[in-house]
Amino acid sequence: MITYADSADAITAGQLRGFFVGWPVAPSPERHLELLRASHAVEIALDGDVVVGFVTAISDGVLSAFIPLLEVLPAYQHRRIGTELVRRLLGQLDSLYMIDLCCDAELEPFYSALGFQTLDRGMGIRRRENV
């Protein structure tokens, strides 16, 4: 049975294996744990003591938030875990005016079903040496 947690305090780096599939340089489990704990808001999906998914938000806590990461382990995809993670995270961010994210075009229907709208523009910098 999948359970959910809104804190990474009880998570260890050893529980964070198999994420960041396809990334040219993946964060180490220790770095992954650091980003979970440093996020303004987090939701974590667990199958027993195995972390199978997570979503994070960074925010000013007043008006805006950005969702940089949503990941579900490949073996657990297509079970609505990602949907539940985002739904729970949006509940944590309910008082904010804007919640933004960037995603690949093929993921737009997933996020649209959760209430997100396509925005016209977005830009970014990727510094792989900092992963």
What are these regions (language model features)?
Residues A8, P68, C102-C103:
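Small/polar loops that bind or transfer phosphate-bearing groups
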Residues S95-V131:
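Conserved active-site alpha-helix within GNAT-family acetyltransferase domains
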Residues M1-E30, G122:
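Short amphipathic alpha-helix that is part of the acyltransferase structural core
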Residues L35-V55:
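Conserved beta-hairpin
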Residues V72, H78-G91:
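Conserved acetyl-CoA-binding loop-helix of GNAT-fold acetyltransferases
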